[in-house]
Swiss-Prot record:
GO terms for cellular component: cytoplasm. It catalyses: S-(2-aminoethyl)-L-cysteine + acetyl-CoA = S-(2-acetamidoethyl)-L-cysteine + CoA + H(+); an alkane-alpha,omega-diamine + acetyl-CoA = an N-acetylalkane-alpha,omega-diamine + CoA + H(+). This is Thialysine N-epsilon-acetyltransferase. Catalyzes the N-acetylation of the amino acid thialysine (S-(2-aminoethyl)-L-cysteine), a L-lysine analog with the 4-methylene group substituted with a sulfur. May also catalyze acetylation of polyamines, such as norspermidine, spermidine or spermine. However, ability to acetylate polyamines is weak, suggesting that it does not act as a diamine acetyltransferase in vivo. CDD domains: NAT_SF (cd04301). Its main location: cytoplasm. It is found in: Cytoplasm. GO terms for biological process: nor-spermidine metabolic process; putrescine acetylation; spermidine metabolic process; spermine acetylation; spermine metabolic process. It comes from Mus musculus (Mouse). GO terms for molecular function: diamine N-acetyltransferase activity; identical protein binding; N-acetyltransferase activity. Homodimer.
């Protein structure tokens, strides 16, 4: 029987990760917002000073099966800093291919990110989810995450493109 393992991504995984980034964006109805390329992903995550870290979920075939291993999910994260609580980790993306959902793979990725965070001395593990993605919302709550919009009233903002250039005076 095939098994699943969660491991650190390698540079050679960038094609699979980029494919899944596009699949996630399509699922979120935001595919028009994906601007990065596989080359940018490779440079930003696997250079001397990576901007992010990534885990992949890999299906390992049972002994005697002819197919090779298959990357079916990923979790892309980075470290941030809170002036209130110190070191934190932020899970930017978590994705499992639809045909592999419901097998606990997403939970394994989340647990591995939590393990990494604790090993790095982080006090919090943060992530965001679209409000209509009820399966993900329910999973995060089941795993013990707190909805900060509900409990503390936090809203999330971003500056991008022209607004960011204008703000910087460029």
């Amino acid at each position: 029987m095939a098994s699943t393992r969660i491991r650190e991504a390698r540079e050679s995984d960038c094609g699979d990760i980029m494919r899944m980034i596009r699949e996630l964006a399509e699922f979120e109805k935001l595919s028009h917002q994906v601007k990065i390329s596989e080359e940018a992903l490779r440079a930003d995550g696997f250079g001397e000073n990576p901007f992010f870290h990534c885990l992949v979920a890999e299906i390992i075939p049972a002994p005697g099966e002819s197919q090779g291993s298959l990357v079916v999910g990923y979790g892309l994260y980075y470290f941030i800093y809170s002036t209130w609580t110190g070191r934190n980790v932020y899970l930017e993306d978590i994705y499992v291919m639809p045909q592999y959902r419901g097998q606990g793979i997403g939970t394994k990725i989340i647990k591995k990110v939590a393990e990494v965070a604790l090993n790095k001395g982080c006090s919090q593990f943060r992530l965001a989810v679209l409000d209509w993605n009820k399966k993900a919302v329910n999973l995060y709550k089941f795993l013990g995450a707190q909805d900060l919009t509900e409990s503390e009233g936090w809203l999330s903002f971003r500056f991008e493109g022209e607004a960011m250039r204008e703000l910087a005076g460029r």
